[in-house]
Amino acid sequence: RLGHRIEHEIKKYGTLPPKDFKKWAIICEHIIRHYTEGWANGFRYNIQYWEIWNEPDGHPDMMQNGMWRATPEEYFELYRITSKHLRTCFGDSIKIGGYASCGFYKIKDAQDVTGEAFGITNELSDWDKRVNHFMNFFYQFIDMVTTEKLPLDFFTWHSYSQPADNIRMQKFCEKYLEKAGLG
């Protein structure tokens, strides 16, 4: 994964976005070259999959997001710049993806795994707000990737649910990505 380290401390230092997204993309390029091409006294590992960040969708209140303390739009811009830069540098020799979504928990109890029947209710708990945020972030991200034809060779997500729920979420994700032309 390209991005920060996971911080469980109260005060977090590595969850703010980079100040210069282009510079960060170049740093990512150098990390990849270090691990795959031996650049800077590095290695020659056969690492093909490179994920851009981790859980930028963690919470609708960016100050409570333990992985990305910035707006969704800022993450989208980071992904846009980094994915294009890495594709230019490496072509199809690496797989570019992300964003390690917090998951599709809204799908868990839904009748329709296509995701087309989901609405947002008026009275929401903090968890409900987060779950809706996960979905909205996903929809916006996929829309950006498809509209702008950005590199997305794979999509990652997490779930800490029961196996049957995970299967429903996986089916939803696969169907949605296929419908968007990314399957």
Q: Which role does the model predict for each range below?
A:
Residues 1-152, 156-162:
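Substrate-binding cleft and catalytic face of glycoside hydrolase catalytic domains
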